[in-house]
Amino acid sequence: MPATAADRIRHWPGFYNARDLGGLPRNDGSVTKTGGYVRSADLRFATRTGLQEMVDSGISTVVDLRNDFETYPVPRSPQDELANAHRIPPTREAELPAGVFAVRVPLDNPEHEAFWQRMRAERRLGTPRFFGPVLREHPERVVAVLRAIAAAPGNVLYHCAVGRDRTGLVTFALLALADVRVEAIASDYALSAGELAPFFARLNFPNQEANINAVLAEQGHTLESAVAEQLDSLDVAAVLLDAGLTREEIERLRARLV
């Protein structure tokens, strides 16, 4: 039986936008396994108790999707300061309990300036409508992240900054590879809207959710339909295989869910 959203959310102290990918309905009528993957916002507020609860749940690897400049509280250069201008304040990588493997594999490549300018011009950034273009045009970073996750020991928590866009893209790929139903993938993405409100409030950072929804509405979409649009027009497994991910790696990624 599919899990409810409440069942999947992880209320570990200091964690935000954290939820398990288990309990989601697949196209064959089964549901995804619990415990293999947890998605999250960054761990800046995670307490020792929260981190221990994460470990006790079975997580043994944390994958950080952020760029270097997002991990330096004091900018190293004017370029770093500019890159962080519209992001939540940077924070160092979390200090994890002994025995937890940590790896950082940046998903974005800021050097693809023309691509990101186009995504802004098309008003795709901050919405799931950038998933397809990234996978089609710059899949190498997605492959690098998924390769690291496939090779990681044990169960995996992965996060970016707020746990919505880059984390959402990785989740989109993982759930598509596990043959999760389109509406379930879309619903999971949409959960971040409510889950991020207290995170933004604690940071005293503007919550852009209303603006994101307004942009999507102008384009004839909701959060859910925007995710479905990306899935309808993309064979995720084929794109990743063409970009160098192996079938063995895909099977290892799937094994935590099916």
Regions found by a protein language model. Give the residues of each.
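Cys-dependent protein tyrosine phosphatase-like superfamily
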Residues: 1-157, 162, 169-258
